[in-house]
Amino acid sequence: MATKLIGGEIYDPAHQIDGKKQDLYIVDGKITHKLPDNEKITATHDLSGCIVMAGAIDLHTHIGGGKVNIARTMMLEDEHAHPHPSTQICRSGNGHVVPSTFSTGYRYAEMGYTACFEPAVLPVNARQAHMEMADTPMVDKGGYVLLGNDDFLLSMMQKKVSQSAINDYVAWILDASQCIGIKVVNAGGVHAFKYNQRRLDVDESGPAGITPRDIINKLSRAVHELGVSHPLHVHASNLGIPGNFKSTLATMAAAEGLPIHLTHIQFHSYGTEGDYKFSSAACEIAEAINCTPNVTADVGQIMFGQTITTSGDTMMQYFGHEHAHPKKWTVMDIECEMGCGVIPFKYRDKSFVNALQWAIGLEIFLQVN
């Protein structure tokens, strides 16, 4: 049983197809350009005048879990100012900075996305995160579960348990949370913040006597040995701090050649040059990515205007709360598993720092192969 798609204008960079009109077939849920001999066409759709291309994937977007609802509660004025009435085919919703679930799905579909992944699922809150994502229409969803600051893993590492034991724990967490990957946020730093520590670099021991390098190494190895499709998803140390590109390079090295994905790397690509002691280190980061085949990254490009930042990195969220706009914020500990910080923020194109952040993201886009 197959479905035929006729007359569409196909764009497929992976196969060097640029605007070619060609028929396609859907067989057993997969798209193919040839119909198998034993298949019969059961439906035909005319796509004349339409563009046919692969759906976009957002591998890091906050669309489910407690922090998103905290953000909605914090920005009620935004919810009220942006109502989205129902139509014949769409349900009602609201919000611009933090849209409701229905509006989130519709906006993603309008932009051509077909899959979105929530990168900060707390094990204790996984059920609620999945329920919220299930309420988001029109796109496939998945999540990465947070480890690397939880007391259980750190206690295992203190006791110097075997790698296989850590692998078992990671596998159990993945199964219990029903997530498709592992995320580490400021490895060991969120745990250190609970002890009133304000910074933790990659080779600095935290209160548990464990370094971020140790945590990243153990978790990246566990994810690799378990055969998880997505590599360890890493929010590196010292987000937003001038000079943090050195921490980012050290984080890449911590994986020791195993696959690792560095997220919103723009926020981890800062130097200390110039009058303001804040500069771009995009060249150094891009060169390192190009020369390190086990490392992938997403940019985390900023957009000017009002937004709200949601993160498990309580250390860095507390550091930035003085810049909240409007002036309200929250950080909290979650069951000794992880942290949560929610801060509204307005990126301004006339701000030196914000304009440079935008330019750094563009540099990375252009320089990474």
Regions found by a protein language model. Name each.
Residues 55-59, 116-118, 141-145, 180-184, ...:
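Hydrophobic faces of well-ordered beta-strands that scaffold small-molecule active sites
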Residues 108-115, 225-233, 259-260, 367-369:
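Short, surface-exposed connector motifs at secondary-structure boundaries
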Residues 50-132:
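Metal-associated gating/positioning segment near the N- to mid-region
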Residues 165-222, 238-249, 255-369:
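Active-site neighborhoods of metal-dependent hydrolases
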Residues 1-53:
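N-terminal metal-binding scaffold of metallo-dependent hydrolase/deaminase domains
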Residues 8, 24, 29, 49, ...:
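Divalent metal-coordination and catalytic microenvironments
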Residues 133-144, 216-227:
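Alpha-helix-loop-beta-strand connector modules within alpha/beta enzyme cores
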